[in-house]
């Protein structure tokens, strides 16, 4: 399977866009914890190496790449709580966390690349959805790593508060142990 690249972003840069944000979320299939989204604006001169869909990167490498993103990129992370998920449903909560991440960037993006087939409503920037975008766009891949590392760290802290669910290992995703309980 090919690695994500910077082709979509390069095309947008050639059209005059300067600040291009990639957006992705994690936690939609979980039975515990928030849905977490990240928006990342890569510096085209300092793209971190190893970027890929967070599901295809080992824990150790995700941590290294996350540090590199922190050092070289503009990003924002946002969550939708369990209560919000219950009130508005997981899809709407995912879109809400994406919108919060985009609006929370300290640089307003000219263009937003969004993983999936739905875009949050009310964005001030132009946007495009890309199905499996975390496997196609480096900006979205970076967002997937930031969202995953941030949410996994949150679930590890939650594991200390509520031992016995193994949240630090399964990050809130259902396991055979949960299904047999």
Please name every model-derived segment:
Residues 1-181:
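RNase H-like, Mg2+-dependent phosphodiesterase core
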